[in-house]
Amino acid sequence: MLQTLHNNLMSNILQDIFKDNYERMIYTLHPRKSVIENVDRMINCGDPSFGGAMYGCGKCGTLKFVPFRCHSRFCPTCGTKYSIDRTTSMSFKLINVQHRHCVFTIDSELRHFFLEDRELLGLLFEAVQSVILRMFHKDNKTEKFTPGFILVLHTFGRDLKWNPHIHCLLSEGGIGNSGLWRAKTHFNYTYLRNAFRTALLNLMEKKLGSSFKKVKAKCYKEHKEGFYVYAKPNKCNPTVVAKYIGRYLGRPVIATSRIDSYDGENVTFHYNRHEDDQ
């Protein structure tokens, strides 16, 4: 008797959307090669024609064929599994202290630079890291307290529009050169906003050259208080931190549960706005 896992034969709504609009995506949007590869893998995920593994019971003789999965983070099925595995791995590396969830955002007028040149995304990590280390080091220049932190890049917002920003899980404390641990619960928001703006704009000017100077000057003029940084206390004990990692580290772009309907042309999905959580 041969059985095939039923769920693997049924395509999810995201697969249907991309199958129906595949040619439009290829010839209208002209996506990058890596995007096409992940879409192809996601579309064919669980398709028995692409192979699988056969399992058999030595007692009753029942055979079960399990189609191979795509293992793409873009896939709502495989991406969720990746997130769970990644969360478990990272949880063992966390310091057993309170953490804080911070978000570093950029001016909307800067977003297109990162869309046109993906290598610039690395500057976001550099800027955030330098700001965090400087904030802790200046508490004691001799000890140079160093915190533990995880940085995750998101290139989209809840509305799925291009919006590169950094999520940071930061320990509320750091270890000094002498091995001394010092707790730190007060984060200077003014410093974080201004320092992040300065660090990022300087890095971008260094990378893009003198042509970026006008944009840089405009950002200083329009954002005199710096770029928005969310860093309010949120009581992230180690258990909560693990949940944050699962939520922000390697999760699929959109869960199928957020897609309300698809009629072959239009997709309706829901999300909660950061501004009012509505």
Language model features with spans:
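Beta->alpha loop/short-helix hinge microenvironment recognizer with preference
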Residues: M1-Q278
